[in-house]
Amino acid sequence: MSIKVGINGFGRIGRILLSNALEKPELSVVAVNDPFIEPTYAAYMLKYDSSHGLFKGDIEVDGQNLVVNGKPIRFYSERDPANIKWSETGAEYIVESTGVFTTIDKAKAHLNGGAKKVIISAPSADAPMFVMGVNHKDYDGTPTVLSNASCTTNGLAPLVKIVNDNFGIVEGLMTTVHSYTATQKTVDGPSGKDWRGGRGAAQNIIPSSTGAAKAVGKVIPAMNGKITGMSFRVPSANVSVIDLTVRLEKAASYEEITSAIKKAADGELKGIMAYTSDEVVSTDMLGNNNSSIFDIKAGISLNPNFVKLVSWYDNEWGYSRRVLDLLEHVAKVDASKK
């Protein structure tokens, strides 16, 4: 089964999606669209990455094509998704990774060019959200536009699922200590409604809002209204960490909670949830394929019903991996419906 993929937006996530797709034999990226760069510049940015290093493969440019490991990838430069001729390359599954077209109405414009399904690599206000290992099996082939939620929701939801399934969560608060992203400022500048967000990203720890915790309630309905959270944007280029503090229904020692997480990570959530007892720091998680890596030694329990859990995630690499996993899952479900 060969799944032909198109990528709209060749920013951080778009480029890392392409790099990851090359490791998946069932996926073939046949087209990329980005109106702000030329193919030669796209090739340069794909080859050299300040966080993930030199691209492991061959990259060339042939007219309007990128040629990656000998395979041509058509490069478009359309501002309006409705004008991208995905059908020219046979691209049926489109990853919408611009961060702009995140509603059903905006993202479905890709269907005009021949796309079959659109997966938004960001949270969406109205598209159904799916998180691998949590609710991906709920996909029934019906939606034409769906969301892979956020990197933080992907890091948080598997952890919440394990804890709630085993011990029950009464309520919880999450803080993500999050690396800065492209939307932030390198030096102080205007930032509309979010004044703190306009301060220099490399100089400050910046409190910020996040909908990631509330979004868990959309993929785990039992958690709706029970978890919320916030973010601290910190002077780090990549890798983030979740601090989840929960009150449990069923009393449990920290060791029992750890045992439940390890069991799930070695079983049903293998490749999505992982764990470590090493004395790790953020850079040790660069390029980690998992959605969430539970740090056994970093958590702490106040009493058997109140515990803090810590879990790392590569907010670029691990998240991009899940987008592609979801795409593969969607394509297989779609094929089974024919």
Curated annotation (Swiss-Prot):
Catalytic activity: D-glyceraldehyde 3-phosphate + phosphate + NAD(+) = (2R)-3-phospho-glyceroyl phosphate + NADH + H(+)
Record note on quaternary structure: Homotetramer.
Any single GO CC term annotated in Swiss-Prot or TrEMBL for this entry: cytosol
Pathway linked to the protein: Carbohydrate degradation; glycolysis; pyruvate from D-glyceraldehyde 3-phosphate: step 1/5
GO biological processes: glucose metabolic process; glycolytic process
Main localisation: cytoplasm
Active-site residues (renumbered): 151 (nucleophile)
Key words, A-Z: Cytoplasm, Glycolysis, NAD, Oxidoreductase
Subcellular location: Cytoplasm
Site note Activates thiol group during catalysis, residues: 178
Name of the protein in its database record: Glyceraldehyde-3-phosphate dehydrogenase
Highest taxon, organism lineage: Eukaryota
Residues annotated for D-glyceraldehyde 3-phosphate binding in this entry: 150-152, 181, 210-211, 233
SUPFAM superfamilies with a match to the protein in the record: Glyceraldehyde-3-phosphate dehydrogenase-like, C-terminal domain, NAD(P)-binding Rossmann-fold domains
Disulfide cross-links: none
Amino-acid positions noted as binding NAD(+) in the UniProt annotation, renumbered to this chain: 12-13, 34, 79, 315
